[in-house]
Amino acid sequence: MARIAGIDLPRDKRIVIGLTYIYGIGNTTAQKILAEAGVSEDVRVRDLSADQEDAIRATVDKLNLQLEGDLRRKVSLDIKSLQEIASYRGIRHRKGLPVRGQNTKNNARTRKGPAKAIAGKKK
């Protein structure tokens, strides 16, 4: 099992898909990493040689990407910063409402949670 950036990649997936299991690496970044490391995108994770694994690890380190815990911490601190300065986005985060301008009159149930009953209102 290939272990890159502290994450065990799924053995049966293609390496380009397996890399996206690392928080902070999407499709485009995975393709760039593999191109720079000189590894084919079609290789399965289980079929990687030790040299290929090392090349991928070295490329990930060389690109200075923020991954996993560091990136999660940065996003969390950015949201806290928005809340502290009481920007519009920070207030929306604090209230648990959509942040990017979506309408909330009818939908937004994912962000707002289950509908709350209103006392005295009958159908």
UniProtKB/Swiss-Prot annotation:
It comes from the Bacteria. Keywords: Ribonucleoprotein, Ribosomal protein, RNA-binding, rRNA-binding, tRNA-binding. PROSITE patterns: RIBOSOMAL_S13_1 (PS00646), RIBOSOMAL_S13_2 (PS50159). The keyword rRNA-binding applies. Belongs to the universal ribosomal protein uS13 family. Part of the 30S ribosomal subunit. Forms a loose heterodimer with protein S19. Forms two bridges to the 50S subunit in the 70S ribosome. Located at the top of the head of the 30S subunit, it contacts several helices of the 16S rRNA. In the 70S ribosome it contacts the 23S rRNA (bridge B1a) and protein L5 of the 50S subunit (bridge B1b), connecting the 2 subunits; these bridges are implicated in subunit movement. Contacts the tRNAs in the A and P-sites. This is Small ribosomal subunit protein uS13. The lineage of its organism: Bacteria, Bacillati, Bacillota, Bacilli, Lactobacillales. The gene is rpsM.
